[in-house]
Amino acid sequence: MPSAVELMGYDFYNKLYHVPYGTVSINGEKLATRTGNVILLRDLFSVAVEKVRAIMEEKNPNMQNKDESAEAVGVGAIVFYYLSNSRIKDINFIMEDALDFNGNTGPYAQYTYARTCSVLNKLSDEANVSVPKVSLTLEKAERDLSKSLSLFPEKVSEAINAMEPSTVTRYILDLCGAFNRFYQSCAISSCEDADKKALRIALTRSTKNILGKALELICVKHPEKI
């Protein structure tokens, strides 16, 4: 490849680096252009978007911007599924698995992001309250979430150095898990301790910001409502 690029007259030929990827199968059937067994990506996107739209119609028929959200979740599900595997591994794509809102998937990550938005919107008058500079005894879920948030720069560097997008997707899933455990075990809006409430709002706000940036790194949109 570098030699071909050099012959084409480009001076960056000696800076090229081959990044190998595994093969892709759909429901166990290997794709191959030589045999004509090809499924276009745009067709996969269309199927995923329609399936998500049907789910949204059933779960929340009065939802606003349903078409935009369905496209973001449907396309994001496929992108996330592909990038969640180590790039050298062969992938068997199963649509139902990719669209599972309860699994280690793009929709699960997007739903978690939407959850942070919902919490902060309900607490809009308090969302920008600064965390008091006092010593607080943290719950385990608060400590775990804080630690997960702090790992973001390190994981991005790992992904860049190894040219491995799955490092970011795995981090996203870890962060979502940490936030959802925190959400289930630590009251936020109903917390009566003002200092703890401010801390929990700050953790939620930080999760929204970092999760949003992480999803953007892998080109997955993050609607505020799903």
Named regions from a protein language model:
Residues 1-226:
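Non-catalytic interaction-recognition regions
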